[in-house]
UniProtKB/Swiss-Prot annotation:
Prenylated FMN binds at I179, Y180, R181, R193, W194, L195, R198, G199. One of its GO terms (cellular component) is plasma membrane. The gene is ubiD. This is 3-octaprenyl-4-hydroxybenzoate carboxy-lyase. It is found in: Cell membrane.
């Protein structure tokens, strides 16, 4: 599906019954979470809450929620019509990530066509962007005027969830786009919770080293178009900007606007011109903090694990200017025990990951991130095994190839006769093909999500790999079992007489 921006996407969803509007007052404090949780579990539509109300406070802007509550809407957001078509996006990314020399004129022509399509989607700058139709400055900057959700009863504060954070490191040609949650702590400050290994945190660290004591510029886009949001969580090759990739998905070049704050403009931070709301500001210096910059204690918040996370210290982002479209829409979500939107996104993006992994490891037959595994904490891999120890090579390959899987705790590898999408078959393979001492790999002191309270220390824990493949000589000295399979002729005979057997 092609579209121009978020509003065009919503209009198309509404025409097909994929979006509904709620005109009854609903509170962003807990009530929207409960409504959206019920919608998501029933594979219901996206929803626009037209009248957000929190007690006596009435908000001027509606709230969009449950946008990515089904895999079909995720696919539509990525320019596809179905989940199956996302494999084609993965093939495109794998070709862009590691292009191969053409083996003939036909392949050369395909390579040229692909390169031209990428080139044609280079983002373009616009001078009068919609995202700057309204500007709040000075005392007008007040985040309490935005209907930010408080998702769960034990949450510490309202939480910005779909903020597209735009940063640039001091030595980077390309901007980084990332989705990081942000706790609202007062009218113009949020706590920026980013993991130490993610792009935004790396840009900030490089800035602090290269420019100690200097404010770090940040822009946050709220209500960006789906392709740009999804591009930020997709393994885009370093040679391709997320904005350019979003244009490929959307079918139209991404329009960008230069931030109004002079220091952000000087840092060449560019934001989606069609975004609903833009936050502009800095992480300010603080000589009293060991990092040299302002930090605050974040959390606790209910998270995609299904638990409240422990508190930790993260940088404070001071918002100095807010720009927006006329009649802006605030895009929000919640996270909780699966299923939630991150789990749905994981199922959809799984189809993008498969061709990328297969390009690097052709022996991989299928790859699956079960939604019960909290998006990425468990991965299942089926493979065409070729030698003893092959499964362990694949385990370490998955952990190291894409940065999305550096936090994966469990990897189970099976043969290609096992259907990964059927837990009954996976459990059968584990219980019949695994000796726990021989076939379990434990790796200690590896990067782990800060939200994983099961790890011994924050951000550092262990990983487990389970080799549930049939064992080859060298892996066992015993005669290996042969699966029971019915004679094909007998099956065909019973098929032919089945309808008459019980008459």
């Amino acid at each position: 599906m092609q579209y121009r921006d978020l509003r065009d996407f919503l209009a198309q969803l509404e025409r097909t019954g994929e979006l509904r509007r709620v005109h009854q007052p609903v509170s962003p404090r807990l009530e929207m979470t409960e409504v959206c949780d019920r919608l998501l579990r029933s594979e219901g539509p996206a929803v626009v809450f037209a009248q957000p109300v929190d007690g006596a406070q009435k908000y001027d802007m509606p709230v969009l929620a449950n946008l990515f509550g089904t895999t079909r809407r995720v696919a539509l957001g990525m320019g596809a019509e179905s989940l199956d078509e996302l494999r084609d996006i993965g093939r495109l990314l794998s070709a862009l990530k590691e292009p191969e020399p053409p083996r003939g004129l036909r392949e050369a022509g395909k390579l040229w066509t692909m390169a031209k399509a990428v080139w044609d989607m280079a983002p373009r700058k616009v001078s009068s962007p919609a995202c700057q139709e309204i500007v709040w400055e000075g005392n007008d900057v007040d985040l309490s005027r935005i209907p930010v959700q408080t998702c769960w009863p034990g949450d510490a504060a309202p939480l910005v969830t779909w903020g597209l954070v735009i940063t640039r490191g001091p030595h980077k040609k390309r901007q980084n786009l990332g989705i990081y949650r942000q706790q609202v702590i007062n009218r113009n400050q949020v706590i920026m919770r980013w993991l130490a290994h993610r792009g935004g945190a790396l840009d900030f660290r490089e800035h602090a080293i290269a420019n100690p004591g200097q404010p770090f510029p940040i822009a946050v886009a709220l209500g960006a178009d789906p392709a740009t949001i999804l591009g930020a969580v997709t393994p885009v090759p370093d040679t391709l900007s997320e904005y350019q990739f979003a244009g490929l998905l959307r079918g139209s070049r991404t329009e960008l606007a230069t931030c109004l704050t002079p220091s952000l403009a000087q840092a060449q931070l560019q934001v989606p011109a069609g975004a609903e709301i833009i936050l502009e500001g800095h992480i300010q210096p603080d000589p009293t903090h060991p990092s040299g910059y302002q930090h605050a204690l974040e959390g606790p918040f209910g998270d995609h694990t299904g638990y409240y996370n422990e508190q930790d210290w993260f940088p404070v982002f001071t918002v100095e200017r807010i720009t927006m479209r006329r009649d802006p829409i605030y895009h929000s979500t919640y996270t909780g025990k699966p299923p939630d939107e991150p789990a749905v996104l994981g199922v959809a993006l799984n189809e993008v990951f498969v061709p990328l992994l297969q390009k690097q490891f052709p022996e991989i037959a299928d790859f699956y991130l079960p939604p019960e595994g909290c998006s990425y904490r468990m991965a299942l891999v089926s493979m065409k095994k070729q030698y003893a120890g092959h499964a362990k090579r694949v385990m370490f390959g998955v952990w190291s190839f894409l940065r999305q899987f550096m936090y994966t705790k469990f990897i189970v590898v099976v043969d290609d006769d096992v259907n990964l999408r059927d837990w009954k078959e996976v459990i059968w393979a584990i219980t019949t093909r695994v000796d726990p001492a021989r076939d379990t790999v434990m790796v200690e002191n590896t990067p782990i999500d800060y939200l994983d309270f099961a790890s011994p220390v924050s951000g550092l824990g262990s990983k487990m790999g389970i080799d549930a493949t049939n064992k080859w000589p060298g892996e066992t000295t015993r005669e290996w079992g042969q699966p029971i399979v019915m004679d094909t002729a007998v099956k065909a005979k019973v098929d032919a007489m089945w309808d008459t057997l019980f008459q």
